[in-house]
């Protein structure tokens, strides 16, 4: 991949990511201005819970399939990826079932006392019940990327991921059924898991049938490759969401709503990093498999320059206009200004 090609593709992905951020903030602004802060806080608690749980249930398969894609492309055997995907889907499904069984053994009183909230047990239960659909959606999104459908992958990750719940939330508001917000959020992933599963299945049908010399990886080999990636993913989700989980035990859901908006604004600074990574990850795996480390170093250096050039202006704008930005979500959300500045400084 040339530097110009990297820049052009990164800009396309960045545009989709930027559009996704705009959509996310429009949705968040709608919630914070038309739903109670308590309900928004419950929604953010459920969203954070399912993100952390999915880091475990995915066990790195969504990242590992990118590696296998690059490896198989370098061996001219991409059609072998179908069997890998099916095994990954079986692995993640088994883990989701284990979560359900494990949580069923925990006393309701214990969970409620742990989080100091009467609704904590039911909110987590709903998250676990929808975990399979959320996990499958995330795996399918990266499978699309592994199958050279980067734009489709980013459309799901950044646009379609928020569109159903945005529409549902508007319907719930105008029908005076706001209390169903969390159920609508979780149900949106049932819809997304089905649509992505259909698209992935259609793409697999277009691949050539496996040949006798194609690569076949066992469950153990896939797990050995994916679990180190799971550790980094879990660490990322914990860093992104554990503060909201911990805050739940000490503050009301209203405070969680205020703080969560600050977190969303702070994550905008990582937009360039994520956009470039989306583009270069399959290429890194492909180049690494050929042992062309000079080419690999050049790709990484070019990527780092692009990330720096895009990130710094965004960081400065957020620092200068933090109060104004928070005010868009409602008057009370300005209370999170200090938290936002601390997050940006970190």
Q: Could you describe each region identified by the protein language model?
A:
Residues 7, 133-156, 341-345:
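Membrane-interface junctions at transmembrane-helix termini in multi-pass inner-membrane proteins
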Residues 8-21, 46, 59-108, 122, ...:
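Membrane-water interface segments that mark the loop-to-transmembrane alpha-helix transition
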